[in-house]
């Protein structure tokens, strides 16, 4: 079971504009291996096309108390992700994977969302009302 999976994570690149660097911030959407996805932190390693950059995927419980395996049910995520990104910045700095721990040095620059399927799975998912809103606080 651990060799093959069907998973979907919404990833943002968190770019350190002051040091021309980046890391990955993930929002867990689905994973057939786990009913509830735990927090994950590691370097992107192990395959030819890896980035070698830090990955921080927040725990599923940061977004919902429902299981990924609630098939047929809508699962709503409505969460301020800035505190989670700040946690990722602190952890990346602590582990020596980034130079800056100043939130003002970082920007969300790209995102990707899609299936990562390493086995012979048949999978489909419907996503509705996907949005990201920035709120400037003085």
Where do the model's predicted regions map?
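Generic serine detector
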Residues: 2, 15, 67-70, 100-104, ...
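Short helix-loop boundary/capping segments
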Residues: 2-82, 86
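Internal, hydrophobic beta-strand segments that form the core of beta-sheet-rich folds
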Residues: 9-11, 77-121, 126
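Exposed low-complexity, polar/acidic, P/S/T/G-rich flexible segments that act as propeptides
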Residues: 17, 115-138
């Amino acid at each position: 079971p651990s060799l093959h999976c069907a998973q979907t994570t919404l990833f943002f690149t968190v770019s350190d504009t002051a040091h021309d660097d980046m890391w990955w911030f993930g929002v867990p959407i689905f994973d057939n291996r786990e009913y509830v996805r735990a927090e994950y932190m590691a370097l992107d390693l192990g395959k030819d096309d890896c980035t070698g950059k830090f990955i921080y995927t927040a725990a599923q419980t940061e977004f919902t108390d429902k299981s990924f395996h609630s098939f047929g049910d809508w699962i709503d995520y409505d969460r301020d992700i800035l505190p989670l990104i700040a946690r990722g910045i602190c952890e990346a700095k602590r582990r020596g994977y980034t130079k800056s721990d100043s939130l003002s040095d970082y920007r969300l620059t790209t995102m990707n969302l899609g299936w990562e399927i390493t086995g012979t799975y048949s999978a489909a998912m419907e996503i509705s009302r996907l949005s990201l809103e920035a709120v400037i606080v003085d």
